[in-house]
Amino acid sequence: TLADGTKVWLNKNTILQYPRNFEGGKRHVYLNGEGFFDVKRNTAKPFIVQSHAMQVRVLGTTFNLKSGENGQRAVATLLKGEVEVKGNHGEGMIVLSPGQQAELDGMTRRLTVKPAEPGIEGWHDTAFDLNQTDIRTLCKILERAYNVKIIIAPDVDIERTYSGPLKKKENVAATLDLIKNSIGIKYKVIGENVFISSSKSK
């Protein structure tokens, strides 16, 4: 929690630079990595998150920003409120609505808007409330939550769905153990890769 009451969750290997107290007419922080922000509303003092590639300006909202030092790709995703996103090198400015994300390609210098990726906030949540969530979407949520890559075999019935609360466990294997029978899968974890196949396959 920052001095103004803003709450920030940082993904691993992320650095957030911020002052002990926010002085002047702005609340300015610098992010390298991925952070989830629940910004305390203050219309007189905008909250600005600066990264290597883009800047996000807000008054009070909930959003996720992912941007590395190399600046090749930066993604800002809005969950609640309104944010203003602009590139650091004249790529333009975009105002996002909830459920949208702005993506900046550092190679082409293009700033585009698209629907938010499912489970974008999952990496910092302690539980997921799932409702008729198909396997492909569920895998995206788990990838975000555990920072892994999930490979789905062709024999998996991706139309199958899962509903209900799912508490985040210490690792992805522990979570998959809870749901594998419900969605008819088996899995194998090799490093940071997870291979999912049908439970009926040999």
Each predicted region: which residue ranges?
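A residue-level detector for the "anchor" residue at the start of short, highly conserved motifs
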Residues: 1-202
